[in-house]
Regions:
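DUTPase catalytic domain/fold
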Residues: 1-130
Length: 130
């Protein structure tokens, strides 16, 4: 079942859905059956490297750099770049609710993909969404 805006608001009021933002704005924009979340300040980018093959069983921390962006500062993503980001909001969902992360169509029309494969948020999750 997909929750409507009324259901989302009721579950927030009941404490089954919690939203806490680092900037103190606790009420996200709630759509007909969705909530808008914002990108946080931290981004992890892959450095350009000469490694032709990446083994998923190995750690490649040296290939990434973490950036902190201040409010209002632009963050430029070049075509073909891959960036990991976290939400500004910490999310808490009850054990009987799951969530999905989807991009906005306005970003999709610009060729920006919000998630590669990890769009599912498990029941009982608490934290920022990557």
């Amino acid at each position: 079942m997909i929750l409507s805006d009324r259901d989302i608001k009721a579950r927030i009021a009941k404490g089954d859905i919690g939203i806490e933002s680092e900037d103190g704005n606790h009420l996200p924009n709630i759509g007909a059956s969705s909530m808008d979340l914002r990108l946080g300040r931290f981004f992890k980018m892959y450095k350009h490297s000469s490694i032709a093959v990446i083994d998923p069983l190995k750690e490649y921390e040296s290939l990434t750099q973490t950036l902190e962006i201040t409010t209002g500062e632009p963050f430029i993503i070049q075509p073909g770049e891959f960036v990991l980001a976290v939400t500004m909001e910490k999310v808490k969902i009850a054990n009987d609710i799951v969530a999905r992360v989807e991009g906005r169509s306005s970003l999709g029309r610009l060729g920006i993909i919000v998630h590669s494969t990890a769009g599912f948020v498990d029941a009982g999750f608490e934290g920022t969404i990557t």
